[in-house]
Amino acid sequence: MFKKVESKVNFPKIEEKVLKFWNDNKIFEKSMQQREGCEEFTFYDGPPFATGLPHFGHFVPNTIKDIIPRYKTMKGKHVKRYFGWDTHGLPVEYEVEKSLQISGRYEIEKYGVDKFNEECKNIVLRYTKEWQKTISRLGRWVDFEHNYKTMDTTFMESVWWVFQTLYNKGLIYESYYVLPYSPKLATPLSNFEVNLGEYKEVHDPSLTIKFKIKDKNEYLLAWTTTPWTLPTNLGIAVGRDIDYSKIFDKEKNETFIIGTKRLNHYYKDDKTYTVIEQFKGEHIKGIEYEPVFDYFLSQRNKGAFRIHTAEYVTTDDGTGIVHIAPFGEEDYNILKKNTKTDMITPIDAECRFTNEVKDFEGLFVKDADNKIIEKLKSMNLLFKRENFLHRYPFCYRTNSPLIYRPISSWFVNIEAIKEKLIKSNEQINWIPSHLKKGRFGKWLENARDWAISRNRFWGNPIPVWICSKTGNKICIGSKEELERLSGQKVNDLHKDKIDKITWPSQYGGTYVRTSEVLDCWFESGSMPYASKHYPFKDKDKFHDIFPADFIAEGLDQTRGWFYTLTILGTALFEQTAFKNVIVNGLVLSSDGRKMSKSLRNYTDPMEVINTFGADALRLYLVMSPVVRADDLKYSDDGVKDVLKNIIIPIWNAYSFFITYAIIDKFEPNSNIVLYKTNILDKWIISEIESLKKTLNEEIDKYNLTKSIEELLAFIDKLNNWYIRRSRRRFWKSENDNDKIDAYETLYYALKNLMLMLAPFIPFLTEEIYQNLKTKDEKESIHLNEYPQEIKELINIDLEEKMNFIRKVVSIARALRASHNIKIRKPISTIYIVTKDQKEQQILSEMKEIILEEINSEEIKIKSNEEELVTYKAKANFRELGSKLGTNMKAVALEIMKLNNEDILKIINGNKHTIKIKDNTYDITLKDIILERHEKENLKVINEDSVTIGLDALITEELYLKGLSRELIRKVQNLRKENNFNVSDRIILYIDNNEILKKIISQFESYIKNETLTLKIEINNEKALTKVELDDEILIKIGIEKWSN
């Protein structure tokens, strides 16, 4: 029935074979078809851009997005999985600009917006085939055929509906505001897009400028770190309650006003100036001054060039006086509140000075710093120049510095729905949970209005038409509405097409669309509605699949997709758009840096898959901290370790079963009796059923970390305890009931383990299942139900007993290893000490297991350590310090004098009284720290409630017995080297060695049974293989198959 398993296995090749099996037999499609009509489990797939190839950062969420839908499908749910593509926005435009070697609004418009958008359309799906191939090779099942694209007209129309709905609710407004702006992209960004980028430590010039007070020969010393904003200076700010000094500078022969606390920074010697007057900032509020540049003198009549008070002014740095220009949010707000000045912005779309600033016309603002400084020097207005190190935001798409500038933009009014957003967040199950109140919760608490317009070209146009005469606005929510108002047929909603659509206004003038396009995050946030063409299609069914049961993406999406989904879900329906979310962290290179193609600091992901297999990579990722939203320092060695320590041991367990099942012609049936008599069988079956229970509970809670931990723990139990301790049951020649029970139990364990592992490592489990399944079972492992526990087979008492024994064995083995006593060398006695009567009972019941595992002749179970150790004691200062005070030292000395008998009494619960002068102190066990000293020939270890001792004295008989085990190992190795089958009987040839003859004479039967040897013969001519016993005894052996 079973097919032979090759000893040398190439896992990537197996995976490719399985992939072909899935595709040829349409297994994914069948898994969907068999769940049609079942309860829906709604999953949203966050759309990636296809302008770049998938990398490790994509592999993490894609693995998670495969595990949960596979699991839910096996649990009987219908899980639609449609892939989506983010096709609009800055990333696409930036790629096209690079390929066309053009830059900025002017060059794009010169090239032609229609041609530019066509290029965007052509490039946007450049890597879709590579994405499909890579994601499929990772093992993810997802429907690429019925994908959605944000550039599809149906998708775009639904986004218009979302916009119009918010607009009609009064949640969208247009305003002039200071926003972070990307000069290279020539568009504003939202505040959360700024956080998607990087803040870098940069050096900027720090200037102290002399501003002359109007009609006086006195100067304000104002500070700035943005020299390029000085041409647009419209005011100066001081702190209302800050102390200022008017001083006379003896060297410069000039009078200055400066923050009093800052005098020491500018004047190291107070003899170089004289204080004329001191006052609060409030005292000079409203005073007029002369601007350093005269470009905008006309603004004086509107309130410019006056001193204002501001809360943000401090004396931590600078002069305590700052210059104000409309290129910062706080500056802008002061000018808006206290003046009627025009919001002058003499810079173009690429942030170059216009002809309004004639001295610096055409210069990029940051490049103008040095020329402005030189100009100030020539005018004798530069008081001091320094360098200022500070953190500055960079564009997340172009990696260039952002500029804060006033600009007209469209906003979603977040302030109006903030409390509802916080309420929506309460409905979400976050994995990890700390994100609810932490990163995401705090982001919502401090959320600001969302700038949703972009001064770009390739995007979903803002559907607002404005009357050229009256300024009246009409917001459009569908193609049909636009066609009705304009009288024109609409096929494509992109900017280059619909900007041509105008219509006359009843008031005179023409309705023309506002020029901006929507932030692509608005589109991805609209994905639940737009991917279904809601509300234009299946409107009545939509709320059956909204909100999503599950989504998964990276930590950065707490300020991206998760955020926009929550905003739009709350704004539209006053509920969250998703119920459960697993958030992964960043995948970094092994040195902790960001993965970079230019740095070549990571291996190509496909090379990793082709070397180690997708299963190993998937398991490596979901075992790591990255699924807990922590960072992962990726390494190929980590994937290699998973292959070595998990994938191969699973295969070895499977290979072991198949090898012996073929030999004994074992054939399973569907009516395996699971009520076994062998304690190992009972135990492993109980562990299987407990694992089923735990996995169903934990995966239902989206706790992948706990699920993986439990699976790996079981694999260890199966391989390193059940199979290892059951080997002889498979080796023996007779097919008795015990042997059949062993086969049935291992078969049951393996098949159920594969079913439980299937969502995590779909390739290996499929390969193994195909050989294990009976002819009447499902075609694929992934068409099966997820295993549910059989409660009556769970024996918690037995599991606890066996786990205690495994713990004892582990401690004892560690003790042997720490003293270099090989496990093959038998010892005479193991002592196990525990005061717990239940533990003593377990040890007594299972002592044969311990004797075998520890390779000991005898076991002695004790309730105290007297036979193993003598004691010394030290004072527990932490416990005694507060009680004893000044007598601490004296009591500590007395404790050190306690003899073994005194300490034993304390261990047994008695108090020991110590008298110091007129004081007596009762010392108990918690007051002392025990030191154990091993008795002669004993090696002792203590862990928790258990102390273990080994008698290390090796007699000649024990020595020879140990050598016999080494001989067995050498013979087994020789069998493997000669490619003997595990069932082959052999003749063992040995050379004429005295020690070897001693070993054979005492342990011949044991050696024969363990090596399937039917005859042992001294034959120097056939014993040709040299081997060492105990690293020092050189012998020769040889083997032949028994042919009689």
UniProtKB/Swiss-Prot annotation:
GO terms for molecular function: aminoacyl-tRNA deacylase activity; ATP binding; isoleucine-tRNA ligase activity; tRNA binding; zinc ion binding. It catalyses: tRNA(Ile) + L-isoleucine + ATP = L-isoleucyl-tRNA(Ile) + AMP + diphosphate. Monomer. It comes from Borrelia hermsii (strain HS1 / DAH). Belongs to the class-I aminoacyl-tRNA synthetase family. IleS type 2 subfamily. Its main location: cytoplasm. It is an enzyme of class 6 (ligase). Its cofactor is Zn(2+). This is Isoleucine--tRNA ligase. Its EC number is 6.1.1.5.
